[in-house]
Amino acid sequence: EAAGKIDADIAVTKDDEFPDLPRFGVRMFLDKKLSAARYFGMGPQESYCDKHQAASHGLYQANVDDLHEDYIRPQENGSHYDCEYVELNNSRYGIVVSAENAFSFNASYYTQEELEKKTHNYELTESDSVVFCVDYALNGIGSNSCGPVVLDQYRFDDVLFRFQFTLIPYVKG
């Protein structure tokens, strides 16, 4: 077993009184030097449960900078859907996340809070970390700003679910 390996097993029963969740996952703030990403999932562009028709399933590499979609009005962006594996690394060390069931991930220099509170992309301030999200599920993107709300089939409304994944940090030899 690798030193520091974490086998996460999160079982959830959502209270009916609780509002719908837009997403469920784990958010980590990692060393900003972990700037290279490699993943097996939908790519190379961002992809969501309702926005992946132009994406292909495969092995991709990108810098964290390139995973961010620079929309004029900041918003949720850069997620990669239907992943089995993601690795963030640099020349000395890295971290790997894998799972038997597909997950989504997002690696960015911007927090979700920063994206929500700013109205123009030039106002964004980078975090001191890589903001790394490993998600069991997210709502679809929809188009409520210029079209319909998220369709029911793309709404995350699970009441009982279990999210299992393995996280392995490593140092290159």
Residue ranges: model-predicted function:
Residues 1-173:
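Beta-strand/loop-rich accessory regions of lumenal/periplasmic or secreted enzymes
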